[in-house]
Amino acid sequence: MLASYASDPLKSRGRLYREIPTSYRNEFERDRDRIIHTNAFRRLQYKTQVFINHEGDHYRNRLTHSLEVSTVARSIANTLNLSSDLAETIALAHDLGHTPFGHAGERALNECMKEHNGFSHNAQSLKILTLLEKRYAAYRGVNLTWEVLEGIVKHNGPISGEVNEYIEEYNSQNDLELNTYASAEAQIAALADDISYISHDLEDSIGAKIIDFNNLAELKYIDQHVFELKSKYKNISSSCLIYEVVRKLMHELITDLLWQTKTNINKEKITHIDEIRNLNYQIVDFTEKTNERIKEIKKFLHERVYKSNRITAISLKCTKIVQGLFKVYMEDVNLLPVNWKIQIDSNNPNSKARIIADYIAGMTDRFAIQEYNQLCSLNFNNI
């Protein structure tokens, strides 16, 4: 049974374009299915999480990461008597707007767009779901419920100060109440993302031999798990050891989050979802001690993994590809597919750059590499 402060699909604020409900799925389940059926969701399979797709078959990509986040979010929401369908749906959609080549690709595209209001993967997720996906005759986008769109835009908290151009444009026709917190389910999706990526980036980095267990000794909290597991299982393999470490880490993070969130709900005497939205802090959270540990792990990953020579070298190549593609398309829009070129508004000075950014952002790693080799390489064998 859902808690009184949960997002109830029967009480949804609805969709921008009214639709008749179905008898066999609630509104959030329907949204989940629509997201899974988008082209953007399928493309996540060939988009970088940390390691480029061709580096190995067992490294996580944006799709496997999104699936893992959704399972964590669903479990947490279930335990708290919140809408697991909404938490799962927001988690599945949270990375739809990512460029090829992960954060390196996003930084490169944002740099290309600095004179055209920049690029944000969060805003791009909204744009994909409300404009760029073309699956239905009656409207553009996939016409998701207000709660899902709110969660995608605000899962990291209220939006204040300068608002992204597309978020502001969409918000003018469907007010997402940008100055408030999102639902507890959206907050769960955001922290499920943190739990998943710090755990699994550690696992993948050990597997890729970017770091080893000696490096993990820098994280006393993690090193203690390593010591205990080695003591218990004398002949444990490295692959099994890191899996067990990550398993323990995820369990402890989830357990901690559940305890602190229940404590917050009880302290604030929460009885309605609007009380969650109007609080002056995030209701779903870790304990202070665990937040500090998470910061340590993120710092470790940043210094030891994301800034490693191997990842840095790959990132430089990826940056060159994204910026190279942007440059050639800006110089000659006839290189764009016709269905993209015709969308350019000659009366809008930002239109060309924005359409090109949308096109590049939707590329998979391998398609971006292929396009770059075709359009930017001096190797005439590519012609």
Curated annotation (Swiss-Prot):
Gene3D superfamilies xrefs: Hypothetical protein af1432 (1.10.3210.10)
Protein's recorded name: Deoxyguanosinetriphosphate triphosphohydrolase-like protein
Keyword field contains Hydrolase: yes
Lineage top rank: taxon: Bacteria
Stretches assigned to the HD domain: 62-198
GO molecular function: dGTPase activity
Gene Ontology biological process terms from the UniProt entry: dGTP catabolic process
Coiled coil: none
Keywords: Hydrolase
Record family assignment: Belongs to the dGTPase family. Type 2 subfamily.
Organism: Rickettsia bellii (strain OSU 85-389)
UniProt-listed SUPFAM superfamilies: HD-domain/PDEase-like
The keyword Ribosomal protein is assigned to this record: no
